[in-house]
From Swiss-Prot:
Gene name of this polypeptide: LALBA
PTM field: Glycosylated (50% of the proteins).
Entry annotated with the keyword Secreted: yes
Subunit record text: Lactose synthase (LS) is a heterodimer of a catalytic component, beta1,4-galactosyltransferase (beta4Gal-T1) and a regulatory component, alpha-lactalbumin (LA).
Annotated organism of origin: Felis catus
Purpose of the protein: Regulatory subunit of lactose synthase, changes the substrate specificity of galactosyltransferase in the mammary gland making glucose a good acceptor substrate for this enzyme. This enables LS to synthesize lactose, the major carbohydrate component of milk. In other tissues, galactosyltransferase transfers galactose onto the N-acetylglucosamine of the oligosaccharide chains in glycoproteins.
Protein name: Alpha-lactalbumin
Annotated keywords: Calcium, Glycoprotein, Lactose biosynthesis, Milk protein, Secreted
């Protein structure tokens, strides 16, 4: 599945658990 940057940042935050990964 393709994600927009907005969706991707939310997914990464969920996976990271701390929101330590941020996309522009």
């Amino acid at each position: 599945k393709q994600f927009t940057k907005c969706e991707l940042s939310q997914v990464l935050k969920d996976m990271d658990g701390y929101g330590g990964i941020a996309l522009p």
